[in-house]
UniProtKB/Swiss-Prot annotation:
Superkingdom, taxonomy of origin: Eukaryota
Organism listed in the record: Vipera ammodytes ammodytes
A Pfam family it matches: Kunitz_BPTI
Reactive bond for chymotrypsin (site feature) positions: 41-42
Misc: Negative results: does not inhibit plasmin, and pancreatic kallikrein.
Signal peptide positions (record): 1-24
Stretches assigned to the BPTI/Kunitz inhibitor domain: 31-81
Protein name per UniProt: Kunitz-type serine protease inhibitor 3
Known tissue expression: Expressed by the venom gland.
Keyword Transmembrane helix: no
Record's function text: Serine protease inhibitor that principally inhibits alpha-chymotrypsin (Ki=4.3 nM). Shows weak inhibition on trypsin (Ki=5100 nM), and plasma kallikrein.
Similarity remark: Belongs to the venom Kunitz-type family.
Cellular component GO terms held in the UniProt record: extracellular space
Length: 93
């Protein structure tokens, strides 16, 4: 296979890995933590993974403390925590 073909294959595999949501058994443990706004009073719209509904939901992060189940974007939350085969919509609290 030519170097151009190998480069194309590598690019396609990388794209596939980025677009494939995580499977249930590979989900990080922090995805099961509850939403935690922290102790500070900033107003930072964020997303957390709700394991009961298998959806990423909006919440307001205060800017400090909290926990690792806190994502700046819905896509980041979905790619990290949502089980494969399910394409949930953005859900509000």
């Amino acid at each position: 296979m030519s170097s151009g073909g190998l480069l194309l294959l590598l690019g396609l595999l990388t794209l596939w890995a980025e677009l494939t949501p995580v499977s249930t058994r590979d989900r990080p443990k922090f995805c099961y933590l509850p939403a935690d706004p922290g102790r500070c009073l900033a107003y930072m719209p964020s997303f957390y993974y709700d394991s009961a509904s298998n959806k990423c939901k909006k919440f307001i992060y205060g800017g400090c403390r909290g926990n690792a189940n806190n994502f700046k974007t819905w896509d980041e939350c979905r790619h990290t925590c949502v089980a494969s085969g399910i394409q949930p919509r953005i859900a509000s609290n």
